[in-house]
Design a protein with these regions (language model features):
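Short, small/polar-rich motifs associated with maturation and membrane association
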Residues: 1-355, 360-369, 377, 435-436
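Surface-exposed loop/interface segments of Gram-negative outer-membrane beta-barrel transport/assembly proteins
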Residues: 243-294, 336-340, 346-435, 453-551
Length: 551
């Protein structure tokens, strides 16, 4: 038995020593990544030690630094460039010149009211296709693009289910006006103003339906859209059916679990009581009498383990000369804050027939969404940090539905019970949205290089919701109008007509090309909103109290 123990001890010691030797061989490798053609530095290049999770990205000057051992292989990857691998040798400095992916330059990208090859694009254009999207349980289209395009910063607005994001292309341009980019989906410019009750302007698009993002960053690329594109343009193209393709059925589903991984460090009930006793001369005897006997962790009481699931089904193919794609999706996302969730149903239909020997191309796109949001009360998070941990959640007082409230103990002002805020506040909405367009692209028979394009689109959103707060959630305990009833409904409409002519001809004899576009665009926005707000008196509970006439 002693020999076996000694052998195990020897093997453990040997393993530790070998680990130290291997670790000691690692050195800091640094360098600069440039473009092989013009020697310009490349920021945002991914540098990874092959076969490991060790990696970094190049900074604004194309510089990188990471730990690696001699013999390790560094893999350099960047969108639009060929991957490159370099083996770490004796030198600690490895500079890399990356070559452009010629095949990528031949790809067609959407720009303005047309498409061009990447090699012909004169402005700053970045295209991100579905194979480069972020992976995982993604329910918002913006999350697909995070970190995938240089100069595009996407910041999630919050952790609530279905929350939107702030998008900036090459930073902000104004202190007072909007800095949001113009977003165009399948040729339809989207209104950046959400309908009441919605928190994400892109929530109607199922992330699984998106084929590419194209980001137009500079003035030459965005000029055709006018001043509304001063903050950049993001073009979203959804998936389509292919001519001659057989029926293809695809299903994608996932289940995710979320937890609050950290809390604000606050005093426990015991620590509060000890501090109060030590400073009783400061707090006063009356305040000490209000201390409870509990050790309530209010933050843990308002958070939960949230289980969410997402399901997507699509059918694509072609019926003779009619390519089609149909998809439906269902998302049930629960928030880690109690009483917050989102249920969303999305549907899309795409038909892309051609006529007259492909001279006339028709694109029909229809997308619909129904979303039910429970927003809860975000104020419960702040109350949970500030609430007295010596108090219990329930004290049995029928005047407050059994919950502990400072009002029951004669206080005039106090932190609301965070559990009441999280559970009793009824802040929910139902949002419906329908967006569709039909586009005709016709090559004139007498001049094939000249194409006429007509795009007709409509975007309609409507919502109804309420934010009803019972009297038990008010911090002001002397005003008789404790509770609030707030009901609203809203409608946003957006109609579009685009018509333009495009002449595109190659003069191979002189190695030149002409591309001219002229057109007319009309867009009309209409918004309506009605709301009713009133206070409730005494013990009325607005969650169950209908609005009174004249309130």
């Amino acid at each position: 038995m002693e020999k076996l123990t000694g052998k195990r001890l020897f093997m453990l010691t040997f393993g530790i020593m070998m680990s130290l030797v291997v670790f000691g061989q690692q050195v800091r490798v640094s360098g600069t990544v440039t473009d092989a053609a013009d020697r310009q530095t490349l920021p945002g290049v991914n540098v990874v030690v092959r076969g490991t999770l060790t990696g970094t990205i190049t900074g604004a000057n194309g510089e990188y630094s990471l730990m690696a051992a001699p013999g390790d292989v560094l893999v350099f990857t960047f969108i639009g460039y060929l991957p490159q691998e370099v083996t770490v040798g004796e030198s600690n400095v490895i500079n890399v010149a990356m070559r452009t992916d010629v095949q990528a330059l031949d790809e067609v990208v959407v720009i303005g009211y047309g498409t061009v090859k990447k090699s012909d694009a004169t402005g700053s254009v970045a295209a991100v296709s579905s194979k480069d999207f972020n992976k995982g349980a993604i329910t918002s289209p913006q999350d697909l693009l995070v970190g995938k395009s240089a100069g595009v910063v996407i910041t999630t607005a919050g952790g609530a289910p279905g929350s939107g994001a702030t998008i900036r292309v090459r930073g902000g341009s104004s202190l007072n006006a909007s800095n949001d980019p113009l977003i165009i989906i399948d040729g339809v410019p989207i209104d950046n103003n959400n309908v009441a009750g919605s928190s994400n302007i892109l929530s109607f698009v199922n992330p699984n339906d998106i084929e590419t993002f194209t980001v137009l960053k500079d003035a030459s690329a965005t000029a055709i859209y006018g001043s509304r594109a001063s903050n950049g343009v993001i073009l979203i193209t959804t998936k389509k059916g292919s001519a001659g393709s057989p029926l293809k059925v695809s299903y994608d589903g996932n289940v995710s679990v979320a937890n609050a991984i950290a809390f604000v460090d606050v005093f426990s009930g015991d620590e509060i009581r000890q501090l109060a006793l030590e400073r009783s001369d400061f707090f006063g005897i009356d305040n000490l009498n209000l201390l409870g006997l509990e050790n309530t962790n209010w933050q843990k009481e308002i958070f939960r383990t949230a289980i969410s699931h997402d399901h997507n089904l699509s059918l694509s193919g072609a019926v003779k000369t009619l390519p089609y794609r149909f998809s439906v999706g269902y998302t049930d996302q629960n928030g880690i804050l109690k009483n917050t969730d989102m249920q969303r149903i999305t549907g899309s239909l795409s038909l892309n027939p051609t006529f007259f020997n492909d001279a006339l191309k028709v694109n029909l796109n229809v997308k619909g969404m129904n979303t039910h949001h429970n927003y809860g009360d975000q104020g419960a998070i702040g109350s949970a940090v500030n609430m007295d941990p010596t108090q219990r959640i329930f004290d049995g007082n029928p005047a407050s539905d059994g919950y502990f409230l400072w009002a029951n103990y004669g206080a005039n002002l106090g932190t609301p019970n965070p559990v009441v805020q999280a559970i009793e506040v009824d802040n929910s909405s139902i949002v419906n949205r329908l967006i569709g367009n039909i586009q005709f692209d016709y090559a004139l028979p007498f001049l094939p290089e000249l194409r006429a394009n007509l795009n007709l689109a409509t975007d309609i959103s409507n919502s109804e919701g309420h934010n009803n707060r019972p009297s038990t959630t008010s911090p002001n305990l002397t005003d008789p109008f404790y509770g609030v009833i707030y009901n609203y409904n809203a409608t946003n409409k957006n109609n579009l007509l685009d018509f333009y002519l495009n002449y595109n001809k190659d003069f191979e004899g002189i190695n030149s090309k002409i591309d001219v576009t002229a057109g007319y665009s009309w867009q009309h926005f209409e918004r309506e909103e009605d709301n009713l707000r009133e206070g409730t008196v005494g013990e009325e509970h607005p969650k169950y109290q209908p609005p009174r006439p004249g309130g």
